[in-house]
Amino acid sequence: MYEIKKIMLHQKGLCYIVLVLLLGTIWLVASDNPYNSAMEQYKSEYEWYLDKVNGYCTDESSLYLEQEAERIAEAKGKKSYLLESYYDGKISESEYKKESQEIGKVLEHQNGFEVIYQQYLYTCENAKNRYFLQTNGWTGLLGGGTLNFVLFLGILLLVTPVFCSEYSCQMDALILTSKEGRKSSLHKLLIVISGVLLMCVSISLIEYGFYSLKYGLPNGNYPIQSLSYFAGSNKSITLFEGYVYIGLLRLFGSVFLAILLMFISVLAKKYAVTLLAGAVSVIIPYVGLSKTIIYRLPLPLPFLLGTDFFAGDIVSRDAFTGDEKIVFAEIHTITLLILFSVSVFLCILAAALILRSNSNKWQMKTRKMRNVPTLAIILSFVLTMTGCSDNGKSQNFIPASNEPSSRACADIWRMPR
């Protein structure tokens, strides 16, 4: 209870958590832009067609869209011809208005059709795992793979003072002589991890609620390949499963970063060094390395990003030569499991070293010294028994002048014990 009060109140941990959630929400609302602006701009027209073809691309929906494309193309051509005829005086104004009304009915949902037709062309490339759906909500929630700087800064502010505050006022010397030093460090670890998890889960739920209200998150059981960002993915997961898995990876990445910061603070024992090392371990790879390299490093950063663990190969094409270049190579499941296992091992090792560095040194030495007297007593007992056994065997060699004494000694050894 004391450690909770110390971290959350005296070190302003609770204030940082609330501030992160508040700023994170404000930043989310202010910076969000729809991935497909036309889908939002012509939402009603798009939904009119989506209701007819929603879900798996069947032969019927494909035929319907192709026929609709021909019908709209003919209407556009007829509209242009009608306008020219009117200006040339070939038709009257009444005839022009009458024909224009009929053409207008065909072109009523034209803008929405262009959006659905582009989605249709994407779906046809691999109809088995690409479905028709509103993509802006899910793309905003899953796509992008960018670092949440608000959460990152919140973790830095929450974790850094936990041990550095004790080193700054030289409380570490007192803790090392206390019986509760190791227990106190364990409580700090658990409290910090709980606070970090609270921030991550809250931000994840806020994002889900925001995109659900603004765009909608329908059809969570559709394949993740329905989003163009995951077009080349070989992972057989749904949209909602992708949200859960990415969220779990980000949770682990946040915990990994928190443990790394505490480990650095125990080694460096200074605020500035801990903050700088924590920032460098995330910012430098994020800015200076390609995603292909980042997602293969046992660092917190790839897990904080999370998204591209489920993306396929991303290829860019040169506009002049037509040559293709792989910008990002897909992370296979085995690679992900190996990277995760190594990272978990590093977390456990760092946590163990943190606990050991804050354990009572005198008690650790005393435990080793307690074994010395025990071994000495056992050794003395063994030597005594060995010595007595030798005396019993040497009776036959005692001179005759000492015969009474030897008999007395023999009688003593024959007595029941």
Segments and roles (model prediction):
Residues M1-P34, K183:
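Internal alpha-helical transmembrane segments
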Residues I17-V20, A272-P285, F303-L304:
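Central hydrophobic cores of alpha-helical transmembrane segments
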